[in-house]
Amino acid sequence: MRKAIIAMSGGVDSSVAALLTKETGDECIGATMKLFHNEDIGVKREKTCCSLDDVEDARNVCYRMGIRYYVFNFSERFKEDVMDRFVDAYEHGATPNPCIDCNRYLKFDKMFQRMRELEYDYIVTGHYARVEYDEEKNRYLLKKAVDDTKDQSYVLYMLTQEQLAHISLPLGGLRKTEVREIAEKHGFVNARKHDSQDICFVPDGDYAKFIEQYTGRKSIPGDFVDTEGNILGKHKGIIHYTLGQRRGLGIPAASRLYVCDISPKTNQVVLGNNEDLFHSELTATKVNLISCESLKEPMRLKAKIRYRHPEQEAVAWQTEDGVLHVRFDKPQRAITRGRQLCYMMEISL
């Protein structure tokens, strides 16, 4: 019998993942990560995925299944590796995805550390993705979920071979409707609970307000400029804008204007036409290849530059410095600094 830690958010997905793992006969405990105190960032407890209500939902599910339940306090690490990184990225003109950092530094790092300390064998999560071992390649592969509408392989791109060897994703072969049916059948209190949509520590979606409150610093106004460098007006501070943004610019023009670039060095926001947002190439650093050690030669693949972005045909190659270069068959809109690139070879990453 192996021993598993179930990472539980209080939602239906992780609850069903816990149930399916328990049904294998393995020893299980449920664990919720305490990431921050809501009052510290000025939000009500019921508005985030880290609320007391969520903890109680997870505890209730574990009680019904007869497994022990714990709350691990990772708030200090969350502040350093997720919230601080989020703020720093926005202040430098990038658009980060903090959910990926949370997976990287908390769920699949800090939780792994706790797993080893408790002498457990693997971690279970409610992500919609699949892990399979390829004997020919002698590597674990990360594959897309059966339910394309819920696939979360994009947010797991950073997983190492060691981590892939010690995780289980029971929902990868199920559809969301099936997961809810299982939860209802077993009387889970969260069977019809809505999925979380927003960044947990910015539930109202106002990133600029959060950053100002979190840092205690007011935004520094600067210039809107066109693609030729001509001043068009004043902006409220670069943290208020992201690439591709059209609304809230307050600049009169004969045609629609969009944010085409953000320069933290000059504190300028570049505005242009929609056509100015399209580019065919990008470079990516901090590369994590799952299906191979490195790209020895150019490779045809499908890539996506955002979580909900459709996969696009492209060719990729890696230079000696480890940087990944990607050229898309068709120009892509708003390739944004700070975002993650995920590529697929057939259904493997």
PLM segments and residue spans:
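ATP-dependent adenylation/nucleotidyltransferase module used to activate substrates
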Residues: 1-157, 168, 178, 184
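AMP-forming adenylation/ATP pyrophosphatase catalytic core
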Residues: 126-349
